[in-house]
Amino acid sequence: MAFRMSRDHADFVAHGGTEWDDGAFVNVKKIKIFHDWAGITLVQFDYIDGTGAIVSGLDHGTEPFQFDREHGRVPVEGARAEFWLRDDEYITIVTAFGGYCVRKIEFITNKRTFDFGGFN
């Protein structure tokens, strides 16, 4: 997963990651985060387009998984978090913490703060 901060701050791109852009939309409606023991593995945004419809952005990263001897690659339970933004709410600040990978990501809106991960 990669994340690039605003132009007036230093760039932050996780090791091996690439910068991404979901395009132009009216507003962010929902943010979905997957994480595992190492940190944030996937970020996905739902947007409101110009007609008022909800559009799902691309998955940036991969869902966390573990290996099971009987079933192979299986999803990790409880490793997903998401939040919906209210109609009058918008993101003002995004902060990511990490080095080799994104360990924690924080979204601050005009009304609330959401933390994902747990490592500073």
UniProtKB/Swiss-Prot annotation:
Keywords: Lectin
Record flagged with keyword Cytoplasm: no
GO molecular function, one term: carbohydrate binding
Domain Jacalin-type lectin, first and last residues per copy: 6-120
Keyword Transmembrane carried by entry: no
InterPro entries per record: Jacalin-like_lectin_dom, Jacalin-like_lectin_dom_sf
Pfam families in the record: Jacalin
Similarity-based family: Belongs to the jacalin lectin family.
Name of the featured protein: Jacalin-related lectin 39
